[in-house]
Structure formats: structure tokens, C-alpha cells
């Protein structure tokens, strides 16, 4: 590989073992390819340049700045010739103009006006013939009518369509001509004036009277016998046709603004039109929830009223029972327990035994509701070992004074009933529970718990 001397190279590299400079890597690649950058002849400085003194040159700025400059045609080729063709990067784009610069044809071309179609103005009659000299006329094609989605509504014509019908042009033949100067319209070469279509005489009176409000008709037609409208009515009809509607949804019958505003006010007063469907659903849900809440509160109040009445009745029964019990316990009652047949009573005393069983059932239900039994299986086993054989219980009549307080009598009866229930539980542990009795006991406990919960829930809002 023939390389020039290193003194002619225009390359620099750092002396580090591990170099991270991209410029150093680029110089290494150029040297490996055998294309190092070489110093140009213009860059060479003479050896005795340091001995010479600096020179100052004066230039006339007016000659260089204000002189007319012409754009050179070969600016791109000159700039490319200054570059070194040895580099591989620039050799790829040799012969191709850069994308950023415009083409020669675009540089040399002058600003040209777009070609416009010429209208023969000799055949047409212009409104102002004096201004025709410096005027450019543009032809606008006919606009296609856009059909609305809703077929029920009547389609209103645009301003361009109105101007076409005013000039009396056919649908496909004609085209509207517009001049760039404001307020100038050029009619077609063969205009047909049909102004009779827009006069109020052309329309029948019944069609005009239905479209107008009644108050306006009373003012314009004081005599109902007139067949043709007066001059004032013609003027007002023309003005109403020219005015655009206030809204797109305005009905055709509401021509006057007062009538439209009254219709709009009526629609706002109706709640069905004021609220959309989504708000209606939310409103219905809220009202239903409020009604349900009121019903639930009424039911709870009724329960609160019922529960104290039940309690009062139970207290009255408890007070009335001690007297009957004291009278019923005059005769001694003997109850014998047999492990095979259970409780047995002696003959002739069945009535007294029935009363005693009713009292036992009442006391056991009260104890279950207030004091829930918390006895485990081990406790039952202990009682099973302590019990020994059948036992005989004898309840003798209490010959106490009737004038004693009722509370003492109730306490004595409660103590006796506790003893009876305790012995009964021991015997049932020995013999084993029956499945039907277990179910009855569970059902009684659940009913008592439900009543207590309802009563506690009813008392909470009263306390608050």
C-alpha cells in the first residue's frame, strides 16, 4: 500500500491505550483503508512567514454589498468540487443534487399566475360595465345538495340554491358565477327572469295564512272577506322569508320570534323534556329507595309497639300465676322416677301433675332465653357418676300465710323448679337424649335468640 509521508497527513489521534473519541476511530479507519486526509497546497505556510509583518487591507463595502448579484447556476457543482472525492461518503452522492436544494428549473422560473378559464363577457349583461377591464371572473360549479338523515324534517335550501332559483336556472345546466370584487354577481349568458315565483301573489292566501301567527293575521287582515293580502302583508312576508331561523329545530309554523320563544318556554316547563333518560332513571331509583326505607322504618316502629305489649302481658300472667299455684298445691303430689318409664304419678292426682309440668316448661324456657346453658360433655359425665339409682320426690303443700309477699312465694317456687330441672338433666344424661327432644330444644333456642335480636335492634334508634 503506497501511502504519502506522515508529514503530509492531516490526521490526529490521542496517545491513550483505550480511546473513546469517535474522531480518533474515524482517523484509524481512514488510515487502514489507505485514504488519510492530506494537507492542501493552500494550507501550506512558508517557513519565513513569521518574519513578515501583518498587512491590513481596506475594502469598499458599498461596492460589494449594493452591487446586483446574480444567482450562479453551478453553485452545487462548485461546492462539490471543493470536497475531497477520495472520501467514500461523498462518492456515493456524486452526480446527485442534495435533497434540501431546489431544482434548477425552480430557481430559474419566474412567478407565474395560474391559468383561469376566460368568460366571454360580450354575451352577458354586467351590472357595472365600467369596472370590467381589471376584473377576473371565476366559475363556481354547482354544489350538490346534502340529504339529511331524518326524512321527516323539511330540507331548507342554501343561499346558493336560493340565488339559482332567483335567476331562474335549471338544475344541471347552470352554474353560479361570482366576481372577486365584493357585491358583484354575473348572470349567465341566457338569463330567464322569473320573479313571479317569489312574489306573494303567486302563493295562495290559505297557504300563507296557515304559516303565519294569528295575531299577525288579525293586524294585516282586519276584514276576513279580502281575497288578496295588502301591501304591508306582502312586505312582512318577504322579510320573514329572508330572515334565517333561530335554530335548526325550529318548527316551520313558528315564523315569528315570539311564537318560537313561547314554544321553547313550554318545552322547558315540561319535566319529560327537561330531564334526559339517564337522569330519569336515577330519579326513579332514588324515589324507590326512599319509599323502601320509609316502609322499613314503619315496620320497625310497629314491632317496637308490639314487643312492650307482649312483655306487659307476660308480667301480668306471672303475677296472676302465684295465686293459682298456691291454691293448686293444697294436696301433696308424689312423683316417682323410673329409669325405664320416666316420671310416674300416683292415681287420683293427674290434674295436679299437669299443672306442675306446665310450670316446669315455663321455667325451663325462661332459663334458656336468659341464661344459656354452658355445660360441656365432661360436666354431664360427672353428673352421671354422682347420680345413684331412682329417686322419689315429694312436694308437700306450703301452709304459709297467704298474706306473705308475692316475691317470697316466687323465690321459693323458682328454687324448687331449679332442683327439678337439675335432677331432670342428670337423668337425661344417664338415659341419653332423644333426637326429637334435641330438635325441639334447638328450635326453642333459635326462636328466643331472634326475639332478643329484634328487641335490641328496636331499642337502638330509640336510645339515639
UniProtKB/Swiss-Prot annotation:
Name of the protein in question: Uncharacterized protein C9orf43 homolog
Residue spans of biased composition, Low complexity class: 293-302
Compositional bias ranges of the Basic residues kind: 303-318
Region of interest (Disordered), ranges: 290-374, 445-464
Pfam families: DUF4647
Domain of life according to the entry: Eukaryota
Entry-linked InterPro entries: DUF4647
Positions with biased composition (Polar residues): 352-367
Biased composition annotated in UniProt, kind: Acidic residues: 445-454
